[in-house]
Amino acid sequence: GGGVATAITEIAGSSQWFSRGFITYANQAKHEMLNVPEELLSAHGAVSEAVVRAMVAGAAQEAGADYAVAISGIAGPGGGTEAKPVGTVWFAWFSPQGISTQEHRFMGDRIAVRQQAVKIAIEELLHKITGCNTVQPYSY
C-alpha cells in the first residue's frame, strides 16, 4: 500500500496540493478510516466496484478533498480466485463530476501489478483534474 502517495510526494511542491493518504490494507481499516460498511465488505469483498466506490467517497469526505482515488486489488502471488484472479484491480476516482470506476486485469509479478496500478490511478486522476486525455508517461 501507499504507492500512489509515494509517487505523488516525489513531486517537488506536492505539499501545496496533496493533503493526505489512507492506507487501508485490512478490511477493518477500510471500515474504521473510510466508513466502508462492514456489510458491503462481506457481501462483495474488498476487491470490488462497490467497495472502491465507498472507499473513495470516504477518503474524499475524511480529507475534505475535491479529488481522490481508491485502489483495491490482488497483487499476488497468492490470493486470487477464478472470479478474481491475481492481477485484478478495482479503481475509483472522486471528482466534482462524481465517482467513476474501472476494473483492470494486470499481468506480471506483484511488483509489476502494483506499478501498473499506480500508473493507471495517477494518469486517470490527472485526466480528471486537467480534463486532458493525454498525460506524460509515468515511470518509476
Model-derived features: positions:
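Short alpha-helical segments enriched in small residues
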Residues: 1-140
